[in-house]
Amino acid sequence: MSKVVHTSGKRKTAIARGTVKEGTGRVKVNRKPVELYEPELARLKIFEPLELAGDIVNSVDINVRVVGGGIMGQAEAARMVIAKGLVEYTGDMNLKDRYVQYDRTMLVGDPRRSESKKFGGPGARARKQKSYR
């Protein structure tokens, strides 16, 4: 039986779930090959963990499904799933260290969320100006 690893990752309001299993190096995000992912900046973000991993990528298939959030939030959530999945699949601590040194958010989530808007102004903190005359 082949080894299958399920992982999940979040960024802002985007949630990604993915599987890493034995294969031929195919990487798909929302059922599309990652090479066709647009815009280019988001595609490059998703490619980062694959390039840092080296030859390991050619022996696994990665499928990622992302929902919610915006384009870059989804890209960073997918990137986290790929990085976590490869580390768990290989069990390689050197790979984990390489990811952490490159960018810690590849493996560790970013807890920041946007603050909700309150009444009395246009945003979360901004208020209507007062005139004292």
Curated annotation (Swiss-Prot):
Q: Which keywords label this protein? A: Ribonucleoprotein, Ribosomal protein
Q: Does the keyword Ribosomal protein apply?
A: yes
GO biological process terms, semicolon-separated: maturation of SSU-rRNA from tricistronic rRNA transcript (SSU-rRNA, 5.8S rRNA, LSU-rRNA); translation
Region called Disordered, residue ranges: 111-133
What cellular component terms from Gene Ontology apply here? Answer: cytosolic small ribosomal subunit
Q: Which family does it belong to?
A: Belongs to the universal ribosomal protein uS9 family.
Q: Name one Pfam family in it.
A: Ribosomal_S9
Which NCBIfam families does this one have?
PRK00474.1 (NF001749), uS9_arch (TIGR03627)
Q: Kindly provide the name given to this protein in its UniProt entry.
A: Small ribosomal subunit protein uS9
Q: Which domain of life is it from?
A: Archaea
Q: Does the keyword Ribosomal protein apply?
A: yes
Gene Ontology molecular function: any one: structural constituent of ribosome
Species whose genome carries this gene: Methanosphaera stadtmanae (strain ATCC 43021 / DSM 3091 / JCM 11832 / MCB-3)
Q: Which InterPro entries match?
A: Ribosomal_Su5_D2-typ_SF, Ribosomal_uS9, Ribosomal_uS9_archaeal, Ribsml_uS5_D2-typ_fold_subgr
